[in-house]
Amino acid sequence: IPVTGAVIVTTPQNVALMDAVKGIELFNKVQIPVMGVIENMSTHICSNCGHEEQIFGTGGGDLLSEQYDIPLLGRLPLNVQIRENADAGKPSVAAGDANAVNYMAIAEKIARALPKAEKDKSRIF
């Protein structure tokens, strides 16, 4: 299966952003288009009270998006419901939980970008 593009997934903290930058630069070097960035664990949502806070910092995905001129595809929270559903064999979208909308929005952005991506069927990496 030919590689059409890469999606960078990072957390907003600086140490993770350094790894994400290495990934972006590697994909650029081997001419694999970076289709966008996803900020994982963007916020923490307390399972008891619903309070939301940014325990890993803020703006990391935005920074990468601006610095490398790639779209910010979305943000995903650090939420116990995501793990519980995955452990039960039902990812958020299949379970229809509150996080499903975030995953669907990201998937739709990637799907819209795919036809625009240049395809090189001769390469697999």
Describe the predicted segments one by one.
Residues 7, 23, 28:
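Ligand-binding clefts of soluble mixed alpha/beta catalytic domains
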Residues 14-17, 54-55:
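Active-site glycine- and acidic-residue-rich loops that bind
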Residues 1-15:
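Inter-motif core of Ras-like GTPase G domains
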Residues 26-125:
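C-terminal lobe/tail of nucleotide-utilizing enzymes
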